[in-house]
Amino acid sequence: MNDSEFHRLADALWLTIEERLDNWDGDSDIDCEINGGVLTLSFENGSKIIINRQEPLHQVWLATKQGGYHFDLKGDEWVCDRSGETFWDLLEQAATQQAGEKVSFR
């Protein structure tokens, strides 16, 4: 994958997260902000989830209260380079914990 393809895929991921949060009807308020290629989810309790892109590595990084994760594209899925879990699984787990209620991005 070249840099422009990586940015196209990362932009699509950011857009999907935004759209799914816009359609989410949970009780908690989750704010989504994109600034300089970094996507920040802010929760009512003051906690945050930070998602950014690492262009030189063609990775997406996810920072949560539980820890940091690095994802490589494998086929059509962003997969954690340590655990093998998908981006969506880890994002949902972290968002659910930080929101205090079930959050789904699917």
Curated annotation (Swiss-Prot):
Keyword Iron: yes
Keywords, sorted A to Z: Iron, Metal-binding
Any single Gene Ontology cellular-component annotation: cytosol
Protein family according to the UniProt entry: Belongs to the frataxin family.
Biological role stated in the UniProt entry: Involved in iron-sulfur (Fe-S) cluster assembly. May act as a regulator of Fe-S biogenesis.
Gene Ontology molecular-function annotations: ferric iron binding; ferrous iron binding
Gene: cyaY
InterPro entries registered for this protein in UniProt: CyaY, Frataxin/CyaY, Frataxin/CyaY_sf, Frataxin_CS
GO biological process: iron-sulfur cluster assembly
UniProt cross-references to SMART domains, sorted A to Z: Frataxin_Cyay
Organism listed in the record: Salmonella dublin (strain CT_02021853)
Designated name of the protein: Iron-sulfur cluster assembly protein CyaY
PROSITE patterns cross-referenced by the UniProt entry: FRATAXIN_1 (PS01344), FRATAXIN_2 (PS50810)
Origin organism lineage: Bacteria, Pseudomonadati, Pseudomonadota, Gammaproteobacteria, Enterobacterales
